[in-house]
Structures are given as structure tokens and as C-alpha cells.
Swiss-Prot record:
Protein name per its UniProtKB record: Large ribosomal subunit protein bL32
Cross-referenced InterPro entries: Ribosomal_bL32, Ribosomal_bL32_bact, Ribosomal_zn-bd
Keywords for the protein's UniProt record, in alphabetical order: Ribonucleoprotein, Ribosomal protein
NCBIfam families: rpmF_bact
Gene Ontology MF term list: structural constituent of ribosome
Biased composition (Basic residues): 1-16
Matches recorded under Pfam families: Ribosomal_L32p
Entry GO terms, CC: large ribosomal subunit
Keyword Metal-binding in annotation: no
Transmembrane segments: none
GO BP terms in the entry: translation
Renumbered residue ranges of the record's region Disordered: 1-39
Length: 61
């Protein structure tokens, strides 16, 4: 069975756990519509991505 040779210091333990925190998602304001959207994602209301029409937006009935 594997056993650690040395005790893990609180500093090393904290550095290992520093990546475990949940981060709030970032949003940017769309240039055309002014809506908030995730970076590198399609704007679902307009269907635009990087200035090109990628999807046809759904019309709410």
C-alpha cells in the first residue's frame, strides 16, 4: 500500500486546493444587441457568432 514519505504541509495542501474554488461565469456585452452573453459562445437571441449568422433564431409564439 502506498504511504506518503513526508507529511503534507498546510502550504502545499492549500496550493493544491486553490484550484478547487468555484468561479463565477464571465459575461460580456454583445456589440450588436447589448445583451449579456458568454465569451466564445453563440448569442442565442440573434444567432450571431463573431459577426456571422450561425443559427436562425427561434421566434417566440
Amino acid at each position: 500500500m502506498a504511504v506518503p514519505k513526508r507529511k503534507t504541509s498546510p502550504s502545499k495542501r492549500g496550493m493544491r486546493r486553490s484550484a478547487d474554488a468555484l468561479k463565477a461565469p464571465t459575461y460580456i456585452e454583445d456589440k450588436n444587441s447589448g445583451e449579456l452573453r458568454r465569451p466564445h459562445h453563440i448569442d442565442l437571441k440573434t444567432g450571431m457568432y463573431r459577426g456571422r449568422q450561425v443559427l436562425t433564431p427561434k421566434e417566440n409564439a
